[in-house]
A protein has these predicted regions:
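Catalytic "initiation/cleavage/transfer" segments centered on a nucleophilic residue
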Residues: 1-7, 12, 21-34, 102-164
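The feature captures the alpha-helical scaffold/lid subdomain characteristic of nucleotidyltransferase
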Residues: 14, 18-21, 90-93
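Residues in well-ordered beta-strands of folded domains
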Residues: 15-17, 68, 133
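Surface-exposed, low-hydrophobicity interaction/linker segments
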Residues: 28-81
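Short, flexible coil/linker elements and helix-boundary hinge sites characteristic
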Residues: 48-49, 83, 123, 162
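Residue-level recognition of the N-termini of beta-strands and the immediately preceding loop/turn
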Residues: 61-63, 96, 127
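Histidine-centered divalent-metal-coordination microenvironment in nucleic-acid enzymes
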Residues: 65-103
Length: 164
């Protein structure tokens, strides 16, 4: 199977899960697609302290990222098995407040593992940015914002032992 582009992946996503979740509501993707030209999606860009508009491709990415957050293991295995990794690089989802960098399939596995751990232990709103480092560095960095910026480093051993 050839690598999917953003739109192909979006269409595939509709076939396996007709809805996607954000923090507040469940949205029917087919209905969303029908009224697509009328949609304006703005979000508050914390980095630049201004409202920003998502272009069409970014909206696709947003939906995909949201879907991946809700999807099951079989679907994740499908994504990795069919080499759809390129599509998943540098996805930004304003509702989930995360930046995801996935250089390869192995890091992708760790990403899902981390998300599962974080979901069990931390509210997503507490993590504005998740950056997955190169595996050679043997660590995963989660940058959290509270009273002050905090950068916490975890090793793969930490993950396996359930530290996060």
């Amino acid at each position: 199977m050839n690598k999917m582009n953003i739109k192909d992946m979006f269409n595939w996503m509709i076939t396996i899960q007709p809805t996607y979740h954000n923090r507040h509501k469940k949205v029917n993707i087919n209905e969303l697609l029908k009224s697509y030209k009328h949609i304006t999606l703005d979000y508050y860009d914390k980095k630049y302290k201004r409202k920003a508009h998502l272009h069409k491709e970014e909206q696709y990415k947003q939906m995909i990222c949201s879907h991946l957050y809700e999807t099951n293991t079989a679907d994740r295995e499908y994504l990795i098995k069919n080499n759809i990794i390129d599509v998943l690089k540098e996805l930004y989802h304003p509702h989930l407040h995360c930046l995801i960098s996935c250089p390869n399939e192995e890091i992708m596995d760790y990403f899902f593992f981390i998300k599962k751990k974080m979901r069990m232990k931390y509210p997503l709103s507490s993590c504005d940015l998740i950056k997955i480092n190169q595996l050679e560095e043997d660590q995963i960095r989660a940058i959290q914002y509270g009273d002050k910026e905090q950068s916490i480093f975890y090793t793969k051993t930490d993950l396996i032992n359930g530290v996060i």
